Every structure is written in C-alpha cells, then in structure tokens.
Amino acid sequence: MFDNIFAAIEKWMRELLSGMVESNLSTMFTAVNQQTSEIAAQVGQTPQGWNSSIFSMIRNISDSVVIPIAGIIITLILCYELISMLTERNNLHNVDTWMFFKYFVKMWIAVYLVSHTFDIAIAVFDIGQSVVNSSSGIIRGNTAIDISSLSMQMQAAMATMAIGELVTLALETLVVSWCLKILSVVITVIMYGRMIEIYLYTSLAPIPFATMSNREWGHVGTNYFRGLFALAFQAFLMMVCVAIYAALIGSIRVSSDIHSALFGTMAYTVILCFSLLKTGSLSKQIFGSH
C-alpha cells in the first residue's frame, strides 16, 4: 500500500519537475529565437525609420543651429583659399580665369555638400540597410532554433534522472532563464545605444562636411564620412554576430548533458553581448575611422 503511495508521489513530483524544466527550457529557447529576430529587426532600420520623431528633432536642430556654424566655417575656408590662391600666383601677376572657375566650382561643391548633408548621410545608411536586408534572408533562415526537436531531447534525457537531479535541474533552468533576461536587457541597451550614437553623429554632420572641399582641413570631413560608413555597416557585423550566436546555440545537444547545455547557452549569450559591443570598434577599424 505504502509502496503505491510513494510511487504515486514520486511520479507526481517527477511530472511536476519535468514539466517545470521543460517549460523553462522552452521559454528560454523561445526567448533566444525572439532575441535574434529582434536584433535583426533593430539593426536593419535607418535613423528615420527607427524613430521618425527623434530624427525630425535632430534634423531641425541641425538645420537651425549647426548649419549656420558650418556656413561660417565655409566662409572662412573659402576666404583663406582665395587669399592663398592669389598670393601663390605671384601677387596677382600670373592670374588666369581658369583658377577662378575652379574656385567657384569648389565653392559650389562646398555649399552643396552642407545644404544636402542629411540627404547624403541618410543615403549612406540606406546603403547599409540594403546590405543588411540582402543578408537577413540568408541569416534569418538559419537562426531559428527547432524547439520541438529540443523538447523531445529534453523528455528523453529527463526520463532517466532521479528526483534530486530534477530538482537541481529545475533550479538551474530558473537561474539561467533569469540571467538570459538580464543579458537581453543589456543587448537592448547596446541596440538603443548604437541608434543614439547615430543620431548624435548625424546632428553635427554639416560641420565636418563644410571642411571636405579644403586641402588642409579635408581630412576632418573624410574621417567623418568614414565614420558614417562604419556606423552603417556596423549593422551588418551585428547581423553576422547574431548568425554565429544562433549557430552556436543550435549546436547544443540537450540529450547529452542538460547542465552543460544550460550554462553553454548562457555563455554564448555573454559572448553575443561582448561581440555586439566590439562591432563598433571593428567597423571603425575596417573603414579607417578614428
């Protein structure tokens, strides 16, 4: 009689703990799938598409505050170039009309660049978005984790476990699940931080663009332009990080060792956070921005 009671209690506890573990793991891997898709959706957006109200505010600030400063810089640069051009020609003794034509062309280019700063900057991010969208079809198709297959592996592995091991496993899944939620917040901060950096970077765009037509100061604008491309293509590097992360998660085999699978998932997520943080410096290094 007591054997039947104890067997029934053990069966009930086993079903309870197995259900808890399976639920935690399914929730965890579902969150991994959602996380990878959310990162792909975030990095694939342009500044105006991510938040149009913030973009409009930054553009208005740039047009009303920064462009007048850029206009002053252009004026100083053009005056300096005109004086240098005239003095280089033996104090106006060797003046020809061609050099004035080149000067006016350079002046027109400088004014055009400043007046179309945001159009040029957004064109750069459109290029980055096009690259991300072209790769997202391939990457997203390989990042989805098959939860049903994992569920079958979990059930087979837990069938041979004792009650004590199931209790330990349930606690481990709970801890790892909470850690993944914290890491998910960190990843969200990284995503939002990149977009805020883009808005701050583009808000001062007219000033470096104003220097691009000058030989001595042109490196300021050139370096800024490289920085724009670095920020735009950082999204592609983030997509590659997500693809690598999903491939690592997909290689985990729950049936062999659930404990290792749990902490392996957490370790891979920490690596993802670190990799996403490194994409900014790596992209700047690739494009030669500093």
Feature annotation, model-predicted:
Residues M1-I73, R89-W98, M107-C179, G218, ...:
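Gly/Ser-rich, low-complexity
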Residues P68-Y80, I198:
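Hydrophobic alpha-helical transmembrane segments
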Residues L76, A121-V124, G128, V186-V189, ...:
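Membrane-embedded alpha-helices of multi-pass transport/permease systems
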Residues L76-L86, I109:
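Core alpha-helical transmembrane segments of integral membrane proteins
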Residues L82-V95, S184-T188, E216-W217:
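Membrane-water interface regions at transmembrane-helix termini and the short interhelical loops
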Residues V176, L180-M212, R226-A247:
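Alpha-helical transmembrane segments of helical membrane proteins, especially in multi-pass transport
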